[in-house]
Amino acid sequence: MRKTYLLGALIAVFALFMQSSAVLAAEKDPWTWLSSNDKYSKFYAPASVRVVSSVMKKRQKTPVATELEAEIKTSFSYAGAEETIRNYNIKHVIKDPGKLAYAVARVRVYPQNRILRYLSETFYDAAGNILWSKGEGREKEMNSQSFDEEFYAAIVDVVFRQGELDRMRADDRWITLWSDESTAGVKTLVTADMSTMRREKDNLIFWAWTEVTDKEGNTVEIKFDKRAVNLPQGTERIISGRYWAPGAGWQELDDGYEGAYRMIAKSTPEERGLMRLRAFADGYGTWVNRYRID
């Protein structure tokens, strides 16, 4: 009996030790890995996420968060450090890219308009010594071309748990709105980014990618734009975007309407896209209305 009791006590002590070790390890390393490539590894600290502002919607008992803050971390390979130093224009401060190991930043996120702002950022060497730091940065809207999009999605998911990160990484993130081929063999394909879709009153707002190829299959035009489609009225407007053409590279997009709404003509490929957007908004109402406060 004494041996059984002693064995049980030892097992209990061992289990307590293992549990305590796990807790200590978690406390020492608050970072959760998000992704890595040959230049960067991205992490965020879930325990650091907090709501700093919220609003109460009519006929709802719980407030909706409108501003979040959190800490993020980026570690660098030599190539990533070199690129970062160049982008920040700090070669006079960090002369050797090999010394830049990682950066920690505090960011503020605005879920309703997919905005992320750096409040502060500090660069470190491998030993944890500060190499350089900066204060508040500009606001950046998150889309498929944004370096910080994974940070944004992970932070928002901590509060809302709507699957922002999963949708961003999904194979069907982009859906075809419409495609068309002219008699000359020129093909146009327009796709919409479901991860950016949100409803604001009658408008469905999202980022779209338009690609035009000639009869030989060469890409002759690309448009990447944020647009608002008024679903009941069947109108749309370009909010912002960029345009690419061979020899010209990427430029700011000028749609010729100066941001005004235009009617989507009937019996056109664009109307097929409108019908698909209406169906999507009806079928995925929870998704397009997430975080909504209007």
Annotate each language-model stretch with its function.
Residues 10-14, 276:
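N-terminal leader/targeting signatures
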Residues 24-225, 229-294:
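N-terminal secretory-pathway/extracellular module detecting exported/lumenal segments
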Residues 14-23:
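C-terminal segment of classical bacterial N-terminal signal peptides
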Residues 1-10:
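Bacterial N-terminal signal peptides that target proteins for export
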